[in-house]
């Protein structure tokens, strides 16, 4: 069967530069690599074909001979002397791929580091008062901690982990297929470079044990829902002495019966009767620091906001303290006595009717607009 053209195999032109050839080879080699196509004979044959084409086209001498004589340049009895018997030179492709195949096929260079401990998250519910003023709380969390018998090594007390005889402590083994070499994680030690001959009786060689621990967490003043507090090194212990992870405390502020928070400002609704709204007066309102008197001017309309400076939340990042904004809500009276109803009827008549346009600017404006609307319709 006639051999395919090397340029055609790699999908490059006859004038392709070496970097184009390397790029094409990487792409095709990853696609047809035996580790990715186990048991696929067709893929294995293509992979060998791709390697052969690559070795010729990246060797200046061999490429020149191939361009002049084709496949005949490498056949026995072909060009004088040949090129060392074809493709048995054992070229090392690890410089081309570096860690590319290492990542794909479980390799990588050097000993695999022991894994850092996992980060943990704890959801903490706070009242608004706790969030505004700050608080210290104790929490209890389940975690993995370093074994106190072997101190994280996993080995029996008085012994040490031994160097792996398979990889000689490197954590890696090299698999070679013809000209192609791939580094893989040592299957004997799982990349650690050491083996535990006599495991610790408490952690059974893991170096970590399950425990619950109690921590005191200081919550700074001014935190809000969504804020996270990081406690470095308070997560799970790392494997075999590796650094511990971190603990993240996630803040959730409970709903308050009186106040709503927006940033560093607090809002509350203050109900008043229509007599106070009309005549003015003082009313007691709550703040997080205690009760204060709010002066309501005469002719106050419902929805009006009164700002009490410095009665809000102090920023957790420093800076000025927020304000308390009181929204006045004028309530319609209910449960009126006959006397009260009569007084209101007399008051209504003094306003000049139900609309009370003389004493109600918004009513006058509204009904003037309604009158104009109907006048325009009838024209």
Swiss-Prot record:
Residues covered by the J domain: 5-70
Keywords, alphabetical: Chaperone, Cytoplasm, DNA replication, Metal-binding, Repeat, Stress response, Zinc, Zinc-finger
One GO MF term: heat shock protein binding
Amino acids binding Zn(2+) 1: 147, 150, 200, 203
Cofactor note: Binds 2 Zn(2+) ions per monomer.
Zinc finger (CR-type): 134-212
Keyword Repeat: yes
GO cellular component, one term: cytoplasm
Keyword Transcription appears in the UniProt entry: no
Oligomeric form and interacting partners: Homodimer.
Recorded family membership: Belongs to the DnaJ family.
Domain notes: The J domain is necessary and sufficient to stimulate DnaK ATPase activity. Zinc center 1 plays an important role in the autonomous, DnaK-independent chaperone activity of DnaJ. Zinc center 2 is essential for interaction with DnaK and for DnaJ activity.
Name of the protein: Chaperone protein DnaJ
Organism, scientific name: Salmonella typhimurium (strain LT2 / SGSC1412 / ATCC 700720)
Gene: dnaJ
């Amino acid at each position: 069967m006639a051999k395919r053209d090397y340029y055609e195999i790699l999908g490059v032109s006859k004038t392709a530069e070496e970097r184009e050839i390397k790029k094409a080879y990487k792409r095709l080699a990853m696609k047809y690599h035996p580790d990715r196509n186990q048991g696929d004979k067709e893929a294995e044959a293509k992979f060998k074909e791709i390697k052969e084409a690559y070795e010729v086209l990246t060797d200046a001498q061999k490429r020149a001979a191939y361009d002049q004589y084709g496949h005949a340049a490498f056949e026995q009895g072909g060009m004088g002397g040949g090129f060392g018997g074809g493709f048995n030179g054992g070229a090392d492709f690890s410089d081309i791929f570096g860690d590319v195949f290492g990542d794909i096929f479980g390799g990588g260079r050097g000993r695999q580091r022991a894994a850092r401990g996992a980060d943990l998250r704890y959801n903490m519910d706070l009242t608004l008062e706790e969030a505004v003023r700050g608080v210290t709380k104790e929490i209890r969390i389940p975690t993995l901690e370093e074994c106190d018998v072997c101190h994280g090594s996993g080995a029996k007390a008085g012994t040490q982990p031994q160097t792996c005889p398979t990889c000689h402590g490197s954590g890696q083994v090299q698999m070679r297929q013809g000209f192609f070499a791939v580094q893989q994680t040592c299957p004997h030690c799982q990349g650690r470079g050491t083996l535990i001959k006599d495991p610790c009786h408490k952690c059974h060689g893991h170096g970590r044990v399950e425990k619950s621990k109690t921590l005191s967490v200081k919550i700074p003043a001014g935190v809000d829902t969504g804020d996270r507090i990081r406690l470095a090194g308070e997560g799970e212990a790392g494997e075999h002495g590796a650094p511990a992870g971190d603990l993240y405390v996630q803040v959730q502020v409970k709903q308050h019966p009186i106040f709503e928070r927006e940033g560093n400002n607090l809002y509350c609704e203050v109900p008043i009767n229509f007599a106070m709204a009309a005549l003015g007066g003082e009313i007691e309102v709550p703040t997080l620091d205690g009760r204060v008197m709010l002066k309501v001017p005469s002719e106050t309309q419902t929805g009006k906001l009164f700002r009490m400076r410095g009665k809000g939340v102090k920023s957790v990042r420093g800076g000025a303290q927020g304000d308390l904004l009181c929204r006045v809500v004028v309530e319609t009276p209910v449960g009126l006595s006959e006397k009260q109803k009569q007084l209101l009827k007399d008051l209504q008549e003094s306003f000049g009717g139900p609309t009370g346009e003389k004493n109600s600017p918004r009513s006058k404006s509204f009904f003037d607009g309604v009158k104009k609307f109907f006048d325009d319709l009838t024209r």
